[in-house]
Each structure stands twice: as structure tokens, then as C-alpha cells.
């Protein structure tokens, strides 16, 4: 936050994005298929957007399967391959494998309120355990970010 502290609304949105990022990270594992991963992350995001009052259950009930309601506030993908190129190309129809590196970068953008929050981690898939977070030493909890901004 530019002023050193998040407003109450910014804090609520930040925490929602952080929860989505954390849940999305746990879903990345060898054998997972891209479309299933993105569908599951979409469910988590939908729940958070309902909690923030940005969507309601009627929006979700009336959504078209090809254009989920959450896309109004989260219009990009959650993850992409990471390699030699910034947005490295990878096979989207084959299962994820151990050793692959992915971004995890959900965001919520609220133009009518004049702000958005996007968080990103880069992770390496491992068998039988959560992905290894290459950015694990960077402050990401809201309180840590505010503390750093006020140091």
C-alpha cells in the first residue's frame, strides 16, 4: 500500500487473493490437468468474491460455463509455465509433472473501486509434497507487507 497501510476494503481483498493463491498452490501436483486446476481455482475465487460482496449466488447460478461470473474480477489465468521465456509455453493437455515450474498469480481487480490486488509465487512441482515455493522468503502476509512499507 502506498500509504503504508491497507484500507479495510483493500485488506479484505488482499486477504482473499492470498487465500486463493495459497489454495491454488496446494492444488498444483504431478498428474493434475490444467483445465481441472483452473476450474477448481475458479471455485475458490468465486467463493471469495461472494464473501467480498462482488458476486452473489444468483450471479453464479446464471453464469455461462464458458464465461464464469468470477471472470468479471479475475480475467486472467491463475498459472502458467515458467522457463526460459517470461510466459513459457507448455503442454496444456498433458498432466503436470514433477520438476515443472509454474507461476501462481491470482488477482482481484475492482475498477469501480479504483484498485486491484495481484499476488504471485513461482513454484516447482514435487511428488508427494506441496510445491517448492521459489519466493518463500519474500514477505506476502498482509501484516508483513505493511510492516515492510512502514520500516
Locate each region found by the language model.
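Active-site neighborhoods and metal-handling regions in enzymes and metal-associated proteins
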Residues: 1-151
Amino acid at each position: 500500500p502506498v500509504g503504508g497501510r491497507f484500507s479495510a476494503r483493500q485488506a479484505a481483498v488482499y486477504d482473499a487473493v492470498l487465500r486463493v493463491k495459497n489454495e491454488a498452490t496446494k492444488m498444483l501436483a504431478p498428474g493434475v490437468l490444467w483445465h481441472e486446476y483452473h476450474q477448481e481455482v475458479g471455485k475458490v475465487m468465486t467463493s471469495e468474491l461472494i464473501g467480498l460482496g462482488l458476486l452473489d449466488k444468483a450471479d453464479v447460478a446464471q453464469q455461462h460455463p464458458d464465461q464464469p461470473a468470477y471472470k468479471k474480477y479475475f480475467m486472467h489465468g491463475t498459472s502458467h509455465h515458467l522457463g526460459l521465456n517470461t510466459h513459457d509455453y507448455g503442454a496444456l493437455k498433458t498432466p503436470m509433472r514433477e520438476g515443472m515450474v509454474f507461476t501462481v498469480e491470482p488477482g482481484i481487480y475492482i475498477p469501480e473501486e479504483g484498485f486491484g490486488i495481484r499476488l504471485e509465487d513461482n513454484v516447482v512441482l514435487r511428488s508427494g509434497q506441496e510445491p517448492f515455493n521459489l519466493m518463500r522468503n519474500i514477505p506476502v502476509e498482509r501484516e508483513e507487507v505493511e510492516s515492510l512499507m512502514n520500516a
